UniProtKB/Swiss-Prot annotation:
Keywords: Protein biosynthesis, Transferase. GO terms for cellular component: cytosol. Its EC number is 2.1.2.9. HAMAP family: Formyl_trans. GO terms for molecular function: methionyl-tRNA formyltransferase activity. It is an enzyme of class 2 (transferase). This is Methionyl-tRNA formyltransferase. Belongs to the Fmt family. (6S)-5,6,7,8-tetrahydrofolate binds at residues 113-116. The lineage of its organism: Bacteria, Pseudomonadati, Pseudomonadota, Gammaproteobacteria, Pseudomonadales.
């Protein structure tokens, strides 16, 4: 490594924590960690620290949790750290140009897509949902636009027919830190230069919400199968049967036709449901108050509940 840098790290979820963990194993000095304020979580709505905050405190690092970085006081606090570089990973706050200009080498971001495809908040899930053949991590030099900065480094990985949002997340969380460390070395040595993104190729990965996780049986089965995988483990696709909510955590393409949402067949292989085009076989479900189960287990004990002819989602 050419030189050890003073680095400010900014990130919030587990994906970001994996990057911080890797940086802590380098000679670089993490002079402060920025993360989102503690948020209410769980049934008790108790204030919970982020994954990044927990890791930072374990290592005795100073933790900053500003509500915003747009005010002069927060910017002066950042400037006082005399950072060479700011590494930003899924932080969740907009960084104004005044902040981007503070570190000597600027700010870099590890983004979980092959930019310019899937700029925005949910690139991992949108890639699976869209049926993309590959995904990856892009390390970019940040600018004021959303994920629009010059690309410093890209690493890619195929998306398999079995990948879920969770499995792809974990793979990218392993690839991203290595790419960031390589990019930092190139920046420090002055050998790495950004490639301008082609805005004409840009797509936007809208933030996930629970409302869109409701399965629309009028859609083609191939799209619903990808949606189930993309939204596992969160927000988890769901439907209803006889007014009872039903979470769908696993599905495969099946054969059959009928009115959308109609149960065509129940067997140990799964619950076959007619879609707008084709049919979807539900293979892993969660009933109210229960845990996720393979449909074969539900079929053994509740087969009468899943009789053919019933309509899901009504």
């Amino acid at each position: 490594m050419s030189q050890a840098l003073r680095i400010v790290f900014a990130g919030t979820p587990e994906f970001a924590a994996e990057h911080l963990k890797a940086l802590l194993d380098t000679p670089h000095r993490i002079v402060a960690v920025y993360t989102q304020p503690d948020r209410p979580a769980g049934r008790g709505q108790k204030l919970m620290p982020s994954a990044v905050k927990n890791l930072a405190l374990e290592h005795g690092l100073p933790v900053m949790q500003p509500q915003s970085l747009r005010n002069a006081e927060a910017q002066a606090e950042l400037a006082a750290l005399r950072a060479d570089l700011m590494v930003v990973v899924a932080y969740g706050l907009i960084l104004p140009q005044a902040v981007l200009d503070i570190p000597r080498l600027g700010c870099i971001n590890s983004h979980a897509s092959l930019l310019p495809r899937w700029r925005g908040a949910a690139p991992i899930q949108r890639a699976v949902e869209a049926g993309d053949a590959e995904s990856g991590v892009t390390v970019m030099q940040m600018e004021a636009g959303l994920d629009t900065g010059p690309m410093l480094l890209k690493v890619s990985t195929p998306i398999s027919a079995a990948d879920t949002g969770g499995s792809l997340h974990d793979r990218l969380a392993a690839l991203g830190p290595k790419a960031v460390i390589e990019a930092i070395a190139g920046l420090a040595a002055g050998t790495l230069h950004g490639e301008i993104q082609d805005d004409a190729l840009a797509t936007y990965a809208h933030k996930l919400n629970k409302d869109e996780a409701r399965l629309d049986w009028s859609r083609p089965a191939v799209e619903l199968e990808r949606q189930v995988r993309a939204f596992t483990p969160w927000p988890v696709c769901h439907t209803s049967l006889a007014d009872a909510p039903l979470k769908v955590l696993g599905a495969s393409l099946g054969q059959g036709s009928g009115a959308p949402g109609t149960i065509l067949e129940a067997s140990r292989d799964g619950l076959l449901v007619a879609c707008g085009e084709g049919a979807l076989r539900l293979t892993r479900l969660q009933l109210p108050g229960g845990k996720p189960l393979a449909f074969a287990d539900l079929y053994n004990s509740r087969r009468e509940q899943f009789a053919a002819g019933q309509v899901l989602g009504q």
